[in-house]
Curated annotation (Swiss-Prot):
Stated name of the protein: Endoribonuclease YbeY
UniProt record similarity statement: Belongs to the endoribonuclease YbeY family.
Oxidoreductase is among the record's keywords: no
Localization terms from the record: Cytoplasm
Biological processes, Gene Ontology terms: rRNA processing
Cofactor binding mode and count: Binds 1 zinc ion.
One GO molecular-function entry: zinc ion binding
Superkingdom of origin: Bacteria
The keyword rRNA processing appears for this protein: yes
InterPro entries membership: MetalPrtase_cat_dom_sf_prd, YbeY, YbeY_CS
């Protein structure tokens, strides 16, 4: 059994939609379960923090344009707070802020319908993808994308979002 890792998860619903799939507690629980499995490559810390924001196509379009120079909405954006050469130890008791995951609920709804699975499952794919990006994963080629998708599938199975 893994030791309990202190994780502070901030979940915001800015989508304007009141859907059971956007309830805060399940996402806090999923991220609390996923983080201890993924922290081996992170600098040691007494705990970790991140923000998950559910939003609209309009907001994610603006962010995608501002930060990635792509004038269109996207499904998920990640803004990692970690730097590659993170070397200085944190003060005792201070959590390490990992960054922000932003998910467009409108795009997730369309993709769930196209992929013929639930919105909850699609959100799981997007949130886990964003989390891996916060932790330094990337997919510059097909092989790395497959590796990332395989890892996401493990995470989703661990919280029963996929069989």
């Amino acid at each position: 059994m893994q030791p309990v890792l202190e994780c502070e998860i901030f979940v915001e619903n800015a989508s304007g939609l009141e859907l059971p799939e956007l309830a805060i507690a399940p996402w806090e629980n999923h991220l609390q379960r996923w983080l201890p499995e993924l922290t081996a490559a992170l600098p040691p810390a007494d705990g970790y923090e991140l923000t998950l924001r559910f939003t609209t196509d309009a907001e994610i379009h603006n962010l995608n344009h501002q930060y990635r120079h792509k004038d269109q909405p996207t499904d998920v954006l990640s803004f990692a707070a970690l730097e590659d050469n993170f070397a200085s130890p944190l003060p005792p008791g201070e959590p390490l802020y990992l960054g922000d995951i932003i998910v467009s609920v409108e795009t997730a709804q369309r993709q769930a319908q196209e992929r013929q699975h639930s919105l909850q499952t699609e959100l799981g794919w997007l949130v886990s993808h964003g989390l891996l990006h916060l932790l330094g994963w990337d997919h510059p080629d097909e092989a790395r994308l497959i590796e990332m998708l395989d890892r996401q599938a493990v995470l989703l199975r661990n919280v029963q979002l996929i069989p």
